[in-house]
Structures are given as C-alpha cells and as structure tokens.
Amino acid sequence: RKQEEKRMGRLLIIGCGGVAGVAIHKCCQNSKTFSEICIASRTKEKCDTLKKKLEATTDTKITTAQVDADKVEELVSLIRSYQPDAVLNVALPYQDLTIMEACLECKVDYIDTANYEPEDTDDPEWRAIYEKRCKEAGFTAYFDYSWQWAYRERFKEAGITALLGSGFDPGVTSVFTAYAMKHYFDQIDTIDILDCNGGDHGYPFATNFNPEINLREVSANGSYWENGHWVETEPMEIKREYNFPQVGEKDMYLLHHEEIESLAKNVPGVKRIRFFMTFGQSYLTHMKCLENVGMLSTSPINYEGREIVPIQFLKALLPDPASL
C-alpha cells in the first residue's frame, strides 16, 4: 500500500508521431503527475530517439516498447507487462477499438484524442453499418462516436473510465464550452469553433497532423448541427473570413468535426453548432489536384503487382508532421 501511495502516475503512451510527440513532451514537463511513461509504437526506434532527446530534461522515468496497435493480443501483453494506471492512445483513429478492447481486458483506464474511423472504408461489414447511420443521422462523415459510445456499459461494468477526445479540438473546446455553460451562461444557443493554423513552415503543401487523417477529413462533406438535426454541405462550400488575434485575417471553411456530435448531446437546448478551420489557397489547390487524380482514395489499387492505398502512398511523400 505504501509503495502504491509513493508512486505517482504511470502512463502507457501508444503512438510516436507528431501529435504523440507533443503529448509526450507535455507529460515530461509534468513529472509530479506523470512519474513514469512508456512510449510504445510499431517502430521502437522512433520511441528510443524521442526518449534520448527527453530523458536529460525531465524527472519522468521513460521506457520504450514495440507494439502493433492493430493486434489486441500484443496490446494486452504490453499492458499486463507494464501495468500502467492509464493508456493514452495517440496512435491512429483506426486503432481506437483494438486499444479499447485491450484496456477492457486488462481493466485499465483509456484516453484518446480522436474518435474511431475505419482504415478501409470499402469493408462490407463496416459499410452496411455506416450507410444505415447515414440515413438515420443525416451526415456522411466516416468518423463518428457511435462505435466508441457503444462501449459505455462494458467500461462501466469493468469499473474503468474511457476519456474520449482529449486533444485541443475535440477536448479543450468541449471543456471551454462546459466551463462557459457552468459559470457564464444560463443558456447557450449557438457554438462556433474556429480552428486557425497560421504557418506553413515554408512548404507549398504540408499538414500539421497525420496527412492521411487530415486529408480524409478536409476533403469530406461538411456538416453542422441545427435545431436538433444535421445539415450537410459540400466540401468547402461554406466559407467565412475572420480576423484572428496575433494571426490576422484568414479564410476559414466549415467542416464536420467530432465534438459537434458530443456537444449536441451534452449542451441542453443548443440550437446550432458549427466548426470552421482555416486553409490557405495553396493548400486547397494542392488538395483539389490530388483529389482529382485519385491520390486521396482509401481504396487499394494494384501497382506493378503490389497493392497500395493511394492516400497512404501520398502520406509517405509529404513532410512528416513530427518534423515541423
């Protein structure tokens, strides 16, 4: 018992890309909360490189491990070996469900930053459920919370917590809304979330997080919540200008985003929720050209006897967000 009280938080972090790197740095800046972390990824060398970079700057004890987050049995083995207080999933949204399954089996709390979406959007089993949801809900985005919210009772029965969407958007945006609702307003009628990125790092085309996920999200139909139902738009159909403090005036476009779904469920009486993100003309022109020639497709193609997914091939050519 004394040993348990002495040890602070032990966190297993799955993922070592751009978003993961930011989360890992932040954990290491808060050693009193995160006294021990294990960084695990399919490529252990990336974890080792980050560990080497950080360990002289923090009191947090850092270890690394190799794991394939697509395989529940590998995740279970790692969780049982490391015995964390919680698992932080900053891998790909494709892997949310396998990591949640492993946490359930090991009875360990779960945290993530983005909701589930499938890697293969042509999978017949997933497609049948997706098309039913499109008709019932009224939006066609590939990602939604239904898959993860379905775990609610199982997590409750296991006595563990799943904290979903704990990045900035979703995450901080939901906290801001809840705080405003509790401390400033009797009623919130409309919520507009504006996401602005003011830099390009000198590249004609780059994404600030995983290119595959980013481009799938941006090239899809937009949607917003109004008067109790979803309203869907064409990609980039709704454009607004906004003068952002310190950044200046930017063009922003309405997108579908996951916190619209959770806020609509948790903000009583809200009449409209929208999400906007800024994009420069160069980004949009590049994206449209890539889409027109099929490079944003998630469907596998055969190239000289090898099966490749165009958007995954494109990801390999673009700047790594972790390097920006």
What are these regions (language model features)?
Residues 57-71:
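Rossmann-fold cofactor-recognition segment
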Residues 182-324:
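C-terminal catalytic/substrate-binding lobe primarily of soluble NAD(P)-dependent oxidoreductases
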Residues 67-84, 95:
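Conserved Rossmann-fold cofactor-binding substructure of NAD(P)-dependent oxidoreductases
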Residues 79, 85-89, 110-112:
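N-terminal Rossmann-like NAD(P) cofactor-binding module of classical short-chain dehydrogenase/reductase
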Residues 11-18:
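Conserved N-terminal Rossmann-fold NAD(P)-binding element of oxidoreductases
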